[in-house]
Amino acid sequence: MASATTLLFHHGSTRVLVARRRCQASVLRPYGGLKPFLSFCSLPNSTAPFRDSLRAKSDGLARAYVTGAPPIVEEPDPKIEESKSEAESKDLISWGLLWSLMSKHKLRLSVCLLTLLGCSTCTLSMPVFSGRFFEVLIGVRPEPLWRLLSKIAVLYSLEPIFTIAFVTNMTAIWENVMAILRAQIFRRVLIQKAEFFDKYKVGELTGLLTSDLGALNSIVNDNISRDRGFRAFTEVFGTICILFTLSPQLAPVLGLLMLAVSVLVAVYKRSTVPVYKSHGLAQATMSDCVSETFSAIRTVRSFSGEKRQMSIFGSQILAYKLSGLKLGTFKSINESITRVAVYISLLALYCLGGSKVKTGELAVGTVVSFIGYTFTLTFAVQGLVNTFGDLRGTFAAIDRINSILNAVDIDEALAYGLERDIHTKKVQDENLKLFLSAGPNVNIRHLDKYYMSNLKSTNNLRTLTWAGDVCLDDVHFAYPLRPDVKVLDGLSLTLNSGTVTALVGSSGAGKSTIVQLLARFYEPTQGRITVGGEDVRMFDKSEWAKVVSIVNQEPVLFSLSVAENIAYGLPNEHVSKDDIIKAAKAANAHDFIISLPQGYDTLVGERGGLLSGGQRQRVAIARSLLKNAPILILDEATSALDAVSERLVQSALNRLMKDRTTLVIAHRLSTVQSANQIAVCSDGKIIELGTHSELVAQKGSYASLVGTQRLAFE
C-alpha cells in the first residue's frame, strides 16, 4: 500500500475515490472482497453466456455504483472533473439560473427595457409640464396653451401604450420561466431517494409547487404595474436626478426621504424574514393537514375522528392567522413610517419652496414641479418598500425550496435513466419539452458522469430477467431514517427463474423490506442483489422498473378511467384499446368493467375509491399483465378479499405468474402451499427453505405457523 497513491475529492453528494488497483480489495471488503464478483464463473449453465463478459468486465463491475462504498476508477477522468464543476452549485433555484432562463428571451427583454424607459420618461415628464401649465396660466410663460396641452395629451396617450407593451412582454417572459421552474422542481422531487418521501409529508412537497413557487411568481407578476418593482426604481432614480437639476437647494429635502426609506428597508429586511418563513411554514402545515385528512377520510369516519381533525386544523388556522397578523403588523408599521416621512418632506418643501418663491429665488413652475415629483417619489418609494417586502417572501420561499430539495441526494440510478430517455431520444410528448428547456446544466449537474458511463447496457436486461435467477446475496439493510435498526441481517435467498417462491414469517421479519429492495426503492446497506449473475445496481432504475411488477394488498389506482389505469402498465407507450381489453379479460376484470356506467371510460375516483377491493385488485393485475414483466412480486395480494373475490383474483394471478420469476408474500399459508419453494424469514434472515411438505416434515418454524393457522380455523 505504500506505493499506492490516493486522491480524494468530492463530487456533489457523491464521494469518489481514485486509487491504484492495489486499493480495490480493501474497498470491496464490505461486500466480501473480490471473491463474490469472481465467483460468477461457477454459475449454472443458464448464465454461461455471461461468464466471459463478467471476467472481462470485473473492473467495470468494481467501479459501478454500490451503496455503502464509493465507486473506484483507476485513473482520474476528465468527465469527472467536468461533472464536479457542474455540481459546485448546489441550489436548485439561484438568481443565476433565473437570469439564464430569462436571457433566452432576448427580443422580449429588449422590448421590456425600451418600454420601461418609455413609461418612466412619460411619468417623469408630467410634473415638468404641470409646472409649465401653471406658468402659462399666470402669464409667466409665453407658450400657447393649446400647444402645451397637446404635448401633455401625447404623454398621457403614450404612457398606457408603453405600459401595456412592458407588462405583456414581462409577463410572457416570467410565465415561461415559471413553467420551467415548476417542471424542474417536480422532476427533482420525483428523482429523490425513497427516504426523502419518508421524511417529508405530502403537504410540504405540495407547498413547494404552490405557495413557495407562488411567492416567486408574484415577485414579478405583482411588481410590473406602475410604481412597483423596476418601474418604481427607475422613477426614484430619475426623480432624484431631475430634482437636483431643477433646484439643488430643494433636492436635499427629498433626498432625506430616500435616506429614511433606505433605513426602513434595511430594518424591514432583518425583521420580516423569520416572519415570512413562519407564515409559509404555517401554510404548508395547513395544506398537509387537509391532504392527510381527506386522503384518509374513511379512517376518520370509522373512528368518528371528525372532531379531533377539526381541532387539529383549528389550531393550525389560529397559528396561520397569528403569523398573518404579525406579518401585517410589520407591513403596516413600515408603510406608516414611510407616509410620515413623506408628509414631513412635503411640509418642508412647502415651507422652504414657498419662502424662495416669495423672495424670487425660485419660479412658481419649479415649485409646482417639485410638488408633482414629491408625489411621484412618494408612490415610487412606497412601491419599492412593497417590492422589498415581496422580495423577503421570495427569498424565504427559495430558501425553503433549496433546503428541502438539497437535504437528500438525488437517486442517481433513477435520474440517469430519465436523462437518457429524455435527452438521447426524440421527445414525442410536447409536455416533456418543459424539462429540456432549462438546459443540461440544470438537469444533470448533480450526476456523476463517470459512474453513469460504467452502467451496463440495458439491451440484455430483459433477457437476463427472463432466463436468470434473482439472488439476494448476504444482504444487510437498515432504513436511512432508522440507521440503528437493522432490518435485514445477512439474508441470502435465490428466486429460481420461472418458478414461484413464497416468503412467510411473522410481522416485522423483513418480508416487505425484501420487496422494497427487489423493487430498488432502496439499495442494500451491504451485500448485493443479482439477476443472471449481474449486480442489479449495474442497471439504471428506469430500466429495472420495466422488468419488475408488483401487486400489493391495496393497489393504488389514479383518478383516471379504468382503461387509463390499465394502460399505465406501459406509461411511456401507446397502448391500443384491444390490448387493454385483452389484459382485462386475462385478469377476470372485463365482465365487471363493461357493467360500469361508462365501461372502460368510467372514472375510478381518487385512489380507485369508486371500485371494490376485488375490482381494484383485478385492474391492478390487468395493469401488470399488460406490463409483461418477467419478475413478479405479490405482496399480500389476496389477503383483504372475500372468498368470491379471492377466487377470481387468484385465478387471474395464476395466469399472471405463469413462466415468471415470482415472489409471493402471504400470511395465509393456504395461498403459498403450491409454491416451488417456501422461505421462512425471521429477524432479517432466511431460517428455513424448502417445499411445503419438506418444511412441515422438518417440524420447525414453518410447521409451527401451519399448526397455528389450523388451530385458528378449527
UniProtKB/Swiss-Prot annotation:
It is a multi-pass membrane protein. One of its GO terms (cellular component) is cytosol. Residues 470-708 form the ABC transporter domain. PROSITE patterns: ABC_TM1F, ABC_TRANSPORTER_1, ABC_TRANSPORTER_2. The keyword Membrane applies. It is found in: Membrane. It comes from the Eukaryota. The chain crosses the membrane at residues 109-129, 161-181, 240-260, 340-360, 361-381. ATP binds at G505, S506, S507, G508, A509, G510, K511, S512. Its main location: membrane. Gene3D superfamilies: ABC transporter type 1, transmembrane domain, P-loop containing nucleotide triphosphate hydrolases. Residues 109-393 form the ABC transmembrane type-1 domain. Keywords: ATP-binding, Membrane, Nucleotide-binding, Transmembrane, Transmembrane helix, Transport. GO terms for molecular function: ABC-type transporter activity; ATP binding; ATP hydrolysis activity. Belongs to the ABC transporter superfamily. ABCB family. Multidrug resistance exporter (TC 3.A.1.201) subfamily. This is ABC transporter B family member 28. It comes from Arabidopsis thaliana.
